[in-house]
């Protein structure tokens, strides 16, 4: 077991040089204190789950102290934001402190968000607020517990440093972990600035360290892009199956690894709404829940354009054409499992689509529907769920088709219940739960955010005494407006 002040660094990205990032030291926040830490994320670095030395956490991740081997850098990239190209973005408030190697030989980026101004701050103050830092922390740890690939969050550090957004708030930092922080926007930056040598250098770096199995391919960069498409198809399928809405799918927020990245005004669906918009700045609904699939394809096409100096256009198009069928296959498999169905059948896609159509416009809680569906026999579960639907006759027709489908597969109810409970969470990160934890933390009480994180780390298990975290949102929490302000 390692200690926090004795980590092994190997800063590979920093060695790419000044064309890729700029050396910047963290700007400390005042009176830093540990808000919450993740035992699961600590384990990735071979660190003990217990955060006994909270002062050391606060010093290191509040910007007051650095490891001797750390090389903090602000990365440069660009990207398409709401469909329009922004030629120069970069880490405006975050620093890649370095890369740590764990005992398994895995490299983990240590990225400190809220570390102060950088050359890419674009008139910003370089700070993150406690509110957004808690939201990113909770999501970064909740999604992996659901089986959704994501960057991770080691801890949040609070402070007395004031910052101004819509109102006066307090600054915080978040320590994010990921195998890489390279985004689609990194490739776009070097493509659109015609720095094709650096573009090739970046592609070679990513391929060597993160897509090593492509080395043996006849055309390694083409093989790498195909894998990026495959990973994103599976990622978006998991988002859609579990009702996760990202909110800001700009290309600079898309990880080259196909993991969920850069959390902002995200949301899990409460009542099912295919057209749900979780970002109140998204007036046109570009990043609505139902648009996440075509937008992911659009973003992959933007990445493909940036790779045209390295890969033949026909090969890029062929890989792009795989996205939708791959997504559909992953999504249907996930939804089949959520319905407790173990064997594929011809009409499964129609069964899923009909269910979602019946949910639309009804007061049906998306997550709890599947959990309740597995609690009892299909007949009893369907009867208890019926009243949540507006068109009960249409639901009855779906229910009969589903009941027959379950009957055809056979098996006993207890096996079905266990199978469904293993994939249908009892606890999901609802916005109102996050908001309650944030409001308590803003008053200096971190009990709620720590408890919520603990509950969400085991979303499929019934946890005695935690029933309040399963409840649907109260009226005030049903339509919380979340902005990009952070």
UniProtKB/Swiss-Prot annotation:
Catalytic reactions on record: L-seryl-[protein] + ATP = 3-O-(5'-adenylyl)-L-seryl-[protein] + diphosphate; L-threonyl-[protein] + ATP = 3-O-(5'-adenylyl)-L-threonyl-[protein] + diphosphate; L-tyrosyl-[protein] + ATP = O-(5'-adenylyl)-L-tyrosyl-[protein] + diphosphate; L-histidyl-[protein] + UTP = N(tele)-(5'-uridylyl)-L-histidyl-[protein] + diphosphate
Record-annotated active site: 252 (proton acceptor)
InterPro entries membership: SelO
Required co-factors: Mg(2+); Mn(2+)
Binding site residues for Mg(2+): 253, 262
Organism superkingdom: Bacteria
Enzyme Commission numbers on file: 2.7.7.-, 2.7.7.108
One Pfam family named in its UniProt record: SelO
Binding residues annotated for ATP, in chain numbering: 90, 92-93, 113, 125-126, 176, 183, 262
UniProt entry tagged with the keyword Nucleotidyltransferase: yes
Keyword line: ATP-binding, Magnesium, Manganese, Metal-binding, Nucleotide-binding, Nucleotidyltransferase, Transferase
Role noted for this protein: Nucleotidyltransferase involved in the post-translational modification of proteins. It can catalyze the addition of adenosine monophosphate (AMP) or uridine monophosphate (UMP) to a protein, resulting in modifications known as AMPylation and UMPylation.
Stated family: Belongs to the SELO family.
PANTHER family: PROTEIN ADENYLYLTRANSFERASE SELO, MITOCHONDRIAL
Record protein name field: Protein nucleotidyltransferase YdiU
Source organism of the structure: Pseudomonas aeruginosa (strain UCBPP-PA14)
